[in-house]
Curated annotation (Swiss-Prot):
The lineage of its organism: Viruses, Riboviria, Pararnavirae, Artverviricota, Revtraviricetes. RNA-binding phosphoprotein p12 is phosphorylated on serine residues. This is Gag polyprotein. One of its GO terms (biological process) is viral budding via host ESCRT complex. A motif (PTAP/PSAP motif) lies at residues 109-112. Residues 112-196, 202-221, 432-536 are annotated as: Disordered. GO terms for molecular function: RNA binding; structural constituent of virion; zinc ion binding.
Length: 536
């Protein structure tokens, strides 16, 4: 009384800081919302026994990891960081995980036992809850779901569901098994108590095979039914985007619900009415009816065949019969096809070109968004080998600037596959500088730039001073030379004559008064110099 059941998923959310630290030690980054989505929605659809509440069973984790790391289109590269972190928590458990990690169970016996196993006291959704010791006077809680190991049904195959036909009478061995069962065992609930589920006899499973399936059937093989709970419908509607906003994500959710819950025709209508608008539902139903194929394997236009495979009115299908179950399987397949076809938008390459890598987005996550845009806005399949070149070019051109520049400079770029480009982009992304390193680099570059600017200013000032000094020197030199010339001109004297040299003709042998070259005409009267008297 008063104790709340702790699941592996809730435990990791309560210790999220430790989970992030473990992911950091694995050189990956995880987000809480995607952690919950992968654990409770994605991984249970892998059909390896992963419960919705999570598990620390190493064998189940290994099986999920194999699915995630599958090559080609069947792999899930965006889920790699999450399963790697979960594996690290299971194989190197911190103190808060150790109570949930059980030792390996002993090897199964060589022959199956005729006595049934006693019911477990834990919840059937997950076998990894902490052991709680009940009080002596407490009554054991009845199990809501009977224990069963029936396999999940693959809706994408044409094989009939693994329901056991209740019609034939039990064999002698079945009677012996029935006699060996406890006499006080209560019969299974009515057919309206469980989701559609059958059970086939399986050999004793080894320790690596999980028996934790979400859907079960009664021990007598009678199909049981549970309608959707209002809380499930509410959570699915409020925790996912609308079909018009993100048809791929909502289609994946409905596909996982169809695979795990195997709803009836009424359940499908309730699911569509809750998750889709009226217009979206009509579009999905129309596309689903277009996908009905005739006997020749081609889409048919015959109304009777379309209404028989995908009726719009409530059909009379009994899920307790093989024929009714086959109708439901085909109906769910057509419904998935209708969701996928209705989710395709008109061709708009501008939308694809608008998908660019975020500053802190990994190349793998960016590639997934790019492929989703191709599926949604173009008629091309990005997984088609013929479209690999287009997707590769979009990946290079729309990557972050630093990654795109380095990818464009790769040697022999034409021979690189999309996987090679993603690996190179991951290397570049992981070698990026941290925000602290970037801040330090910007600070250092700013200081260097300021230092260069100061040095340039000082050099310019020195050059200006040198030019000014040179001009001043020229000016002073001009002034000094002019003064020297003036001084030399003022001190100029007549050239000296020899004793017998004529001052007029510069010839020797006579003086100027006797110079023959000097004109001898009468001299004119000298002009008298008028002197001014004081009276004047």
């Amino acid at each position: 009384m008063g104790q709340t059941v702790t699941t592996p998923l809730s435990l990791t959310l309560d210790h999220w800081k430790d989970v992030e630290r473990t992911a950091h030690n694995q050189s990956v980054d995880v987000k809480k919302r995607r952690w919950v989505t992968f654990c409770s929605v994605e991984w249970p659809t892998f059909n390896v026994g992963w419960p919705q509440d999570g598990t620390f069973n190493r064998d189940i984790i290994t099986q999920v990891k194999i699915k995630v790391f599958s090559p080609g289109p069947h792999g899930h590269p965006d889920q790699v960081p999450y399963i790697v972190t979960w594996e690290a928590l299971a194989f190197d458990p911190p103190p808060w995980v150790k109570p949930f990690v059980h030792p390996k169970p002993p090897l199964p016996p060589s022959a199956p036992s005729l006595l049934p196993e006693p019911p477990l006291s834990t919840s059937p959704r997950s076998s990894l809850y902490p052991a709680l010791t009940p009080s002596l006077g407490a009554k054991p809680k009845p199990q809501v779901l009977p224990d069963s190991g029936g396999p999940l049904i693959d809706l994408l195959t044409e094989d009939p569901p693994p329901y056991r036909d209740p019609g034939p009478p039990p064999s002698d061995r079945d009677r012996d098994d029935g006699e060996a069962a406890p006499a006080g065992e209560a019969p299974d609930p009515s057919p309206m108590a469980s989701r559609l589920r059958g059970r086939r006899e399986l050999p004793v499973a080894d320790s690596t095979t999980s028996q934790a399936f979400p859907l079960r059937s009664g021990g007598n093989g009678q199909l049981q039914y549970w309608p959707f709970s209002s809380s499930d419908l509410y959570n699915w509607k409020n925790n996912n985007p609308s079909f018009s906003e993100d048809p791929g994500k909502l289609t994946a959710l409905i596909e996982s619900v169809l695979l795990t819950h195997q709803p009836t025709w009424d359940d499908c209508q309730q699911l569509l009415g809750t998750l889709l608008t009226g217009e979206e539902k009509q579009r999905v139903l129309l596309e689903a009816r277009k996908a009905v194929r005739g006997e020749d394997g081609r889409p048919t236009q015959l109304p009777n065949e379309i209404n028989d495979a995908f009726p719009l009115e409530r059909p009379d299908w009994d899920y307790n019969t093989q024929r009714g179950r086959n109708h439901l399987v085909l109906y769910r397949q057509l419904l998935l096809a209708g969701l996928q076809n209705a989710g395709r938008s008109p061709t708009n390459l501008a939308k694809v070109k608008g998908i660019t890598q975020g500053p802190n987005e990994s190349p793998s996550a960016f590639l997934e968004r790019l492929k989703e845009a191709y599926r949604r806005y173009t008629p091309y399949d990005p997984e088609d080998p013929g479209q690999e070149t287009n997707v590769s070019m979009s990946f290079i051109w729309q990557s972050a600037p630093d990654i795109g520049r380095k990818l464009e400079r790769l040697e022999d770029l034409k021979s690189k596959t999309l996987g090679d480009l993603v690996r190179e982009a991951e290397k570049i992304f992981n070698k990026r500088e941290t925000p602290e390193e970037r801040e330090e680099r910007i600070k250092r570059e700013t200081e260097e730039k300021e230092e260069r600017r100061r040095a340039e200013d000082e050099q310019k000032e020195k050059e200006r001073d040198r030019r000014r000094h040179r001009e001043m020197s020229k000016l002073l030199a001009t002034v000094v030379s002019g003064q020297k010339q003036d001084r030399q001109g003022g001190e100029r004297r007549r050239p000296q004559l020899d004793k017998d040299q004529c001052a007029y003709c510069k010839e020797k042998g006579h003086w100027a008064k006797d110079c023959p070259k000097k004109p001898r005409g009468p001299r004119g009267p000298r002009p008298q110099t008028s002197l001014l008297a004081l009276d004047d």
